[in-house]
Amino acid sequence: MNPNMNMMPMSGPQMMQVMQSSPSGPPGPVQHQQQQPPQPLQQQQQAEKLDNISRVKSLLGPLRESMFLTIRSSAFALQQNNLADNLKRDTGAHHVPRFDKHLEDFYACCDQIEIHLKTAMQCLQQQNSSNHYLPGPVTPMRMETFMPDNAGPISYPTYLNTVRVHIQSAKDIHDTLISAAQNISQAD
């Protein structure tokens, strides 16, 4: 028995459809070929894993579940305490769900959501700052070509030179401020 064969019963039209969709070739020994998953799908899944907003969306289900368990365990604990206070029933025999454990799980989900939202907000602020101070898009390839005025994306070496100029300007301003502060302190 071949483990690669599906043992599902098929009707005539389904069998014909499978036969037509299978690659044409002589029936014989099955050749095992390694199939590689398409690269764009993998990159999309990796980008989705890295996206903070999608992480927040995936945490909403566990957050709802932990909130439900927390409220349910607190209601059960209140009911058991009320019965014990009224001396109606002995509460030692029943299994009481751990309210503190469920509350801790709820807060852990809230903390994870908060971290992902803060990270997404910081990424958005960084992107806005980047768009403000360097409005042209950057091509990811290293290529040395001439750049006509307003031709679109700037090359990576041009981007590196722009960053170097910005860093040097910031250092010059920093050094000027330090020397001015030292001159003021020496004058006093």
UniProtKB/Swiss-Prot annotation:
One of its GO terms (biological process) is sex differentiation. Residues 1-43 are annotated as: Disordered. Residues 1-23, 30-43 have a biased composition (Low complexity). The keyword DNA repair does not apply. It is found in: Nucleus. The keyword Nucleus applies. InterPro entries: Mediator_Med29_met (IPR021018). Keywords: Activator, Differentiation, Nucleus, Sexual differentiation, Transcription, Transcription regulation. One of its GO terms (cellular component) is mediator complex. GO terms for molecular function: DNA-binding transcription factor binding; transcription coregulator activity. It holds the Pfam family Med29. Component of the Mediator complex. Self-associates. Interacts with dsx. Belongs to the Mediator complex subunit 29 family. Component of the Mediator complex, a coactivator involved in the regulated transcription of nearly all RNA polymerase II-dependent genes. Mediator functions as a bridge to convey information from gene-specific regulatory proteins to the basal RNA polymerase II transcription machinery. Mediator is recruited to promoters by direct interactions with regulatory proteins and serves as a scaffold for the assembly of a functional preinitiation complex with RNA polymerase II and the general transcription factors. Required for female somatic sexual development. This is Mediator of RNA polymerase II transcription subunit 29. The lineage of its organism: Eukaryota, Metazoa, Ecdysozoa, Arthropoda, Hexapoda.
